[in-house]
Amino acid sequence: MRETMQLVPMVVEQSSRGERSFDIYSRLLRERIIFLNGEVDDTVSALVCAQLLFLEAENPKKPIHLYINSPGGMVTSGFAMYDTMRYIRAPVHTLCMGTARSMGSFLLMAGEPGTRAALPNASILIHQPSGGFQGQASDMLIHAEEIRQTKHRMTRLYAEHCGRSYEEFETAMDRDRFMTVQEALEWGLIDRILEVREDAAA
């Protein structure tokens, strides 16, 4: 995302007060569109959370549109975005363009029910969280228990949001599980597949 932001085009608008220029993401933010593009980390999470809170302050009833193209990333950073999406009053509509893997798919399915969508050639991946802690054996056991609890929490939330049983998602997430958009629709991660933008969409 940081590399992408270095190549951001500018948009110039004319008004009665003269000419104003915006980077493309700022201009889209005015339309209540937020991009999650690239790996999920603390920096990206802070930016997305700040934009969610800003748009809610502007209008707590008007939908926010979160466009996702992400391979996933840090679980804690993803949970920060998930909790913020649930915390704000404005409904968050999610759309996968490209891919939504790991924490990306978690955020995709966390959108407002009925508004979670994907483009036809998007790909979606679910799996259990992983960790790479090194250190003393006693500390490794502590971290292993934390990962186990995180896995349980994520599995439960997938099941709740998607209308499936805990056991179904526990089995599906045991290894990397790639899905087409049609499979994601059947599993309840999304509500629809969009080929053309609808008038009501952002």
Curated annotation (Swiss-Prot):
It is found in: Cytoplasm. It comes from the Bacteria. The keyword Signal does not apply. Its EC number is 3.4.21.92. InterPro entries: ClpP (IPR001907), ClpP/crotonase-like_dom_sf (IPR029045), ClpP/TepA (IPR023562), ClpP_His_AS (IPR033135). Keywords: Cytoplasm, Hydrolase, Protease, Serine protease. HAMAP family: ClpP (MF_00444). Belongs to the peptidase S14 family. Fourteen ClpP subunits assemble into 2 heptameric rings which stack back to back to give a disk-like structure with a central cavity, resembling the structure of eukaryotic proteasomes. Cleaves peptides in various proteins in a process that requires ATP hydrolysis. Has a chymotrypsin-like activity. Plays a major role in the degradation of misfolded proteins. This is ATP-dependent Clp protease proteolytic subunit 1. It comes from Agrobacterium fabrum (strain C58 / ATCC 33970). The gene is clpP1.
